[in-house]
Regions:
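Sequence/fold signature of self-assembling virion shell proteins
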Residues: 2-14, 25-48, 166-192, 196-204, ...
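Intrinsically disordered or highly flexible coil/loop and linker segments, enriched in small
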Residues: 22, 26, 51, 139-147, ...
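Assembly/oligomerization interface modules of large self-assembling protein complexes
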Residues: 31-111, 164
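Extracellular structured ligand-interaction cores
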Residues: 98, 105-107, 131, 229-231, ...
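Alpha-helical scaffold segments that mediate packing/assembly in large oligomeric complexes
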Residues: 114-212
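Phosphate-interacting basic helix/loop segments used at nucleotide- and nucleic-acid interfaces
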Residues: 212-221
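Beta-rich carbohydrate-recognition and catalytic domains
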Residues: 224, 235
Length: 405
């Protein structure tokens, strides 16, 4: 470590000790992070990701208890015939299911090599860069666990489970375990027999396109009082969005059609719902829900940390842990669709291709007519010359009518 790096790193360590109320020499021993510091760190973790800013990251006092829940679950309006002796009954404003939450320890341990610190020491914001690097990685790991976690291993294996599947059950796994009736992963007939082990999307498949699949899942798997919720979104990965919009851009287009394609792609909608692309989401799945239906609970006073300078390996080691859990607030406000198979597009036969070409020409003609109409409507009106308006010419009066003989 260079002299300048040592000076800036020591300043970072001094600041860390000051914030947590410990001596600088005790940072290599495990200490409890001050609650205010933990809150600040968790806020920075949330703010570092556009996705995390839209979900809940909530401190809870207990390791295990009931969930906080959404603002309102279900309906509360009712009628009661009190004159007939019936009593009015209140509805639970925020129904809590029996699952609850269970915060368990998750480690966020890492090391930074001396040569990396030497590079960062060239900048005036050395401490900010070091802090932000830690915060960003923790944020990405939490997203990865939330969408890929399936179980909790006593000792995790990053080589065997590169997507952190063995750290903790994530949101998708919670749906599989606690609300299987709201998970669609195969096609089942009315008699219960399995028609297809996959959800085939495309020509000749179970659904013509992703829009139909999302609409079907919304109508059949989500509770009726949530189906019309304007905050519902479709959470998915990059690949599904690419497969949906690729045909729009994989062709030569006139400027007008290219602009229309850009507009459609920029809106990013699936099944008439906004599509939200998040990192590390499974490529063959999508989750329909409100963003605030997903939460990360972290237990207060469980944030532990210590930093060690391991000169034998030319690096600084940071050991950090906190108790946390991934929570779905209300399973009725969501549906998980997975095991999606996108079928390859079938080649267009000559007759259909000719019809499509003809249809395309009609559309271009219509588009041109609309453009001309808009131009005409936008153009200033030309002044109209004054014209004497004459009434209908009077018929000649017969002399006899005048009284002539």
């Amino acid at each position: 470590m260079r002299k300048q790096t040592r000076f800036k790193f020591n300043a970072f360590m001094s600041r860390l000790a000051e914030l947590n109320g410990v001596d600088t020499g005790d940072l290599d021993k495990k200490f409890s992070v001050e609650p205010s510091v933990t809150q600040t760190i968790m806020t920075r973790v949330q703010d570092s990701s556009s996705f995390l800013t839209r979900i809940n990251i909530v401190p809870v006092p207990e390791m295990k208890a009931e969930k906080i829940g959404l603002d309102v679950s279900g309906t509360i309006a009712s009628n009661t015939d009190t004159a007939g002796g019936d009593e009015r009954e209140t509805a639970d404003f925020a129904t809590l299911d029996a699952e609850g939450y269970f915060c368990q320890q998750v480690n966020y341990d890492f090391h930074i090599r001396y040569n990396t610190l030497d590079l960062w020491a060239r900048y005036q914001d050395f401490q900010t860069r070091l802090r932000d690097a830690i915060v960003k990685r923790q944020a990405l790991d939490r997203i990865m666990i939330g969408f890929n976690g399936t179980h909790r291993a006593k000792t995790s294996n990053r080589v065997k489970f590169p997507l952190l599947q063995d750290i903790a059950p994530g949101w998708l796994q919670k749906y599989r375990e606690n609300a299987p009736s709201r998970v669609m992963n195969k096609v089942v007939a009315e008699d219960g027999s399995v028609v297809s082990e996959k959800l085939r999307v495309g020509a000749g498949g179970d659904y013509a396109n992703l829009d139909a699949l999302v609409m079907d899942a919304t109508n059949n798997l989500i509770a009726p009082w949530y189906q019309e919720d304007p905050e519902l979104v479709v959470i998915c990965g990059r690949q599904l969005l690419a497969d949906k919009y690729f045909p729009l851009v994989n062709q030569e287009q006139p400027n007008t059609e290219a602009m229309a394609a850009d507009l459609i792609i920029s809106q990013k909608r699936i099944g008439n719902l906004p599509a939200v692309r998040v990192p590390y989401f499974p490529a063959d799945a999508l989750l329909i829900t409100r963003m605030d239906n997903l939460s990360i609970y972290w237990q207060e006073d469980t944030h532990r940390r210590h930093m060690v300078e391991n000169s034998k390996r030319d690096r600084i080691e940071n050991y950090e842990s906190i108790n946390e859990d991934y929570v779905v607030e209300d399973y009725a406000c969501g549906a998980l669709v997975e095991n999606i198979e996108l079928l390859p597009a079938k080649p267009t036969d000559p007759q259909t291709k000719a019809a499509l070409t003809s249809s395309g020409e009609d559309i271009k003609t219509l588009a041109g007519a609309i453009v001309e109409a808009v131009k005409a409507a936008a153009a200033p009106a030309e002044p109209v010359a004054d014209v004497e308006v004459k009434g209908p010419e009077e018929a000649p009066v017969d002399d006899k009518v005048k009284g002539g003989k």
